[in-house]
C-alpha cells in the first residue's frame, strides 16, 4: 500500500522532533530588530531561557526577559507549552508590578509590538498539529521537505502553515502562515544554523515578516549555552517579579 501524504508528513515531523530531544535546557541572548512599513527600525535586547520537559503530557517551558531599552526592562513572558490543550502564558509588567495571564483568545495578538504572536513563542510540540507531505523543494538553495501542517489546539490565529524542513539535518528553514480566513499572513525564515554539543542545531538569524502590513521583526542570537544550572524553580510564576 502506498504511503499517504499524512503518514509521510508525520514521519518527517517526528524525525525532526526526535533529533532535538535531550538538550536539557538552554539560555541565549537575543537582539530584536523591529521594522515598520516605512523601513524605520528600533532595537531591543532580551534573554530566552528554555527548560526541556521530557513528559509526554506536557511541553517545554520558556522564559523571555527584556533587558533594554529601559522602558521595557524587566518585562517577561513565561510559557508552559501544552500538547493539545491551550498553552499557559503569563506576561509580567514591571511598571505595574503585575502578572497578566494571556487568554487563549489573545494568543494571536502581537507580543510586545513585534510580528511574533504569543503562540509563536511556545515550543512546537509534535502533537499540536496534523501534517501532510507536499513534496520536495529547494528553500534558499537547500533541498527540503515541503509540508503542510494544521494546528489542532484552541485559539490559533493560523488556519494552516506551510513548512520547509531540510533533508540534511531536519532543520526548519521556513514557515509560511495563513490566517483564519485562509489568506497569507506571515513568513518566518530561519538562517545561520550552528550546532551545539555535536547534536543540536539552532538558527541564529530569524525573521518574521508580516505579509499583510509590510512590518517585520528580526531576532539575532548570540551563542547558546546548554545544560546550565536552570531548574523548575526558575520557571515558577511567582518568580517573575524577582527577575534580574
Region roles according to the model:
Residues 4-95:
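N-terminal mature ectodomain segment of secretory-pathway/periplasmic proteins
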Residues 27-29, 43-45, 61, 128, ...:
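Broad gene-expression machinery/nucleic-acid interaction feature
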Residues 30-32, 64, 131, 149, ...:
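Preference for bulky hydrophobic residues occupying beta-strand positions
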Residues 47-54, 132-138, 192-194:
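Short amphipathic beta-strand and strand-loop transition segments with alternating hydrophobic
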Residues 78-80, 88-92, 98-102, 107-124, ...:
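Gly/Pro-enriched, hydrophobic low-complexity segments
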Residues 123-130, 136:
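Surface-exposed beta-loop interaction hotspot
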Residues 242-244:
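Short, cationic low-complexity segments
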